[in-house]
A protein has these predicted regions:
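Catalytic cores of the polymerase beta-like nucleotidyltransferase superfamily
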Residues: 1-503
């Protein structure tokens, strides 16, 4: 791989390692991509692999979806892609982007490409919508990228490396910088501030001082970005292998005050008597511990909670957001947070709804927040079978996530206390497993259904059937499965004590 722009040789060892990785990855670049480069060259146009795929090559990662930039117009690009691919489509012609797919051959995966004409966007002050203008140079196109590590390219088919802004040196040094001034870059598109936090999590990059200073000064600008775009960046951050650095960027720069204010609010002041822990740091630790308890991956979904699991991670991060509103200093110097799980569930629902998360995710995270303290009543292992059934029923399909959230919520440094909690939860899981051997716990129902209730009581459909059903469900919770005759008699006894209204 040749280079058209030499980079700062420091740190030399890190640069050399990155270059070796890139050579390995780019050597395995899909032959179809190189063929595509030749097709553009034959038509008199430039084509370069740009952005994330180039960055990832230096990190030793491969990308299935490939992004290209070209000197060709969208119309010219479409003609070339129609010949190269098995399918092509208009992604955003007004933005210069055409997509194509070449189907799998000889066992290789499909090759999907997006090709965009060189652009030199201009933004009006205070606007996040660019005036799109097509450019004529690769360097000009790279200058509009968000960060230098994403402003690298490889010309095809020659495999010439292009790095006008020192992105490779920044990647080797582990620093996140912008190709133009950070103020200008974030004013052009404030979402780039969220992307900075996301890359801190995904790539382990630290923010250049100019980038950090600009975010601190411009955090309020994120308000003009749609909630959906903010949500998507937050989701990508949380699904990183280690979200903590990205979350710390959000909080430390003030960006979280705008997009997730409940998180920085957890930095409760620690008084001189240390009467409570820093709930913010506790929550970050719970998140890390929950991630460690995920099972398998989305690619290899083994176990009950394959990671990365967004619902579990959101619940781990936000489970204590009700504490600031419920904090009380009690006599004797203690601090209480009574009912913070209920208050927190409401806050979680409100915030995630505002961020446009889907209803299922909102309900699940709010429910886990509401239930995260339920286990602590089991500390002395005195729950009845009925209480265990209710625990399982209340958690429903979230039970495996609740197991992991509850275990992760123990961050005490007191080893004896931590062991006690762990042993107690082991015992609860054992109790659940034993009950499952004898009865169905996944969806507990009364031993009689609605039709049977009506037949025994000699009544038709109506509210009385529902009341009887709820009574039998309570019996099922309390006593487990019972003989049908016993349940039928219990139903008649209930009907005698609770006659229909008006009789």
């Amino acid at each position: 791989m040749s280079t058209s722009a030499p980079c700062d040789p420091q740190p030399a060892a890190a640069l050399a390692a990155l270059q070796r990785r890139a050579l390995s990855v780019l050597a395995g670049l899909a032959p179809e991509a190189l063929e595509l480069g030749s097709a553009f060259a034959a038509a008199g146009h430039e084509l370069a692999l740009v952005g994330g795929p180039v960055r990832d090559a230096f990190l030793g990662r491969t990308s299935q979806d490939l992004d290209f930039a070209t000197s060709a117009t969208p119309e010219q690009t479409e003609v070339i892609l129609a010949r190269w691919g098995d399918a092509h489509w208009d992604i955003g012609r007004e933005f210069g982007t055409i997509g194509a797919r070449r189907f799998a051959r000889s066992g290789a995966p499909d090759v999907v490409v997006e090709v965009t004409t060189y652009r030199t966007d201009e933004y009006e002050t205070g606007s996040r919508k660019p005036t799109v203008a097509f450019g004529d140079t690769l360097d000009g196109d790279l200058s509009r990228r968000d960060f230098t590590v994403n402003a690298m390219a490889v010309r095809l088919p020659s495999l010439t490396f292009v790095d006008p802004f020192g992105g490779l040196a920044d990647l080797a040094a582990g620093v996140l910088r912008t190709p133009v001034s950070a103020d200008q870059s974030f004013d052009d598109d404030p979402l780039r501030m969220m992307r900075a936090a996301r890359f801190a999590a995904q790539l382990g990059l630290r923010l250049d001082e100019d980038v950090r200073t600009a975010i601190e000064a411009m955090a309020e600008r994120i308000e003009i970005v749609s909630a959906e775009r903010v949500r998507d960046e937050l989701t990508k951050l949380l699904l990183a292998a280690d979200p903590r650095p990205g979350l710390e960027v959000l909080v430390d720069t003030g960006l979280a005050d705008q997009v997730l204010p409940e998180l920085p609010a957890l930095r409760l002041e620690i008084d001189e008597h240390h009467r409570h822990k820093d709930v913010y740091q506790h929550s970050l630790t719970v998140l890390a511990q929950a991630i460690d308890l995920e099972t398998g991956t989305h690619e290899d979904p083994t176990g009950p909670v394959p990671g990365p699991d967004l619902v579990l991670r959101l619940a781990a991060l936000l489970h204590d957001v009700g504490k600031p509103a419920t904090r009380r200093f009690e006599a004797g110097g203690t601090v209480s947070f009574h009912h913070h799980e209920l208050v927190g569930a409401k806050l979680v629902k409100k915030r995630l709804t505002a961020l446009r998360f889907d209803k299922e995710t909102v309900r699940a995270v709010a429910r886990l927040t509401e239930l995260h303290l339920r286990f602590h009543g089991y500390g002395d292992q005195v729950w009845t079978d009925s209480a265990v059934r209710r625990y399982v029923t209340d958690a429903g399909p979230l039970l495996e996530r609740l197991h992991r959230l509850t275990r992760s919520d123990s961050t005490t440094r007191n080893r004896r206390k931590a062991d006690h909690l762990s042993f107690a939860y082991d015992d609860l899981e054992r109790r659940i497993a034993e009950l499952r051997e004898h009865e169905e716990l996944a969806a507990i129902r009364p031993d009689l259904d609605g039709q049977q209730i009506m037949a025994i009581l000699g009544i038709g459909p109506g509210p009385r059937v529902g009341a009887a059903y709820r009574h039998l469900l309570e019996l099922r919770m309390e006593h487990g499965p019972q003989d049908r005759a016993v349940v039928a008699q219990a139903l008649r006894d209930w009907a005698t004590v609770n006659p229909p209204s008006g009789t």
